[in-house]
């Protein structure tokens, strides 16, 4: 439902299986998110993935199918998860930013999304700026030096909970 209801996500693309709870390397969530091309990310592991640096999804046409994880599912913690593209579907994921590095007051889930985004059956907590914020910045390098904020379009956030922010900016 909603504005993002027509996004194809990773439909028709390759299926990438996450086999490791490590932050980076073969079979990791980071590797799957940073791969190009249409893709559906599934899990054959469950547990906590502790990020040492933010994950940025930059290549469009991706579905993250958290419901495929066995047991208690997947929780992303320790750093931010950023949507910096279009046509993304995220289902059944937990994001817990946490206060490991308070010098960077970032969101649990955020990014510079263009549009056609679905976030469904997800939760985000312990963000240091907001728990979730999606907006679009386009940086204009004209003589003024100011960036532009453009609208993000066709976003659906449904059946999700965003709670327990850690800072006064939330």
Region spans (language model):
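Active-site-proximal loop/turn and secondary-structure-junction residues that shape catalytic pockets
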Residues: 47, 136-138
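Extracellular beta-strand-rich solenoid/capping regions of secreted or surface-exposed proteins
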Residues: 29-37, 48-65, 72-91, 97-115
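Short, solvent-exposed beta-strand edge segments and adjacent coil->beta transition regions
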Residues: 13-15, 104-106, 129
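Right-handed parallel beta-helix
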Residues: 61, 66, 70, 86-97, ...
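Acidic/polar N-terminal loop/beta-strand segments that form early-domain functional surfaces
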Residues: 19-23, 43-46, 54, 67
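Blade-edge beta-strand/turn elements of extracellular beta-propeller
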Residues: 20, 73-76, 165, 169-170
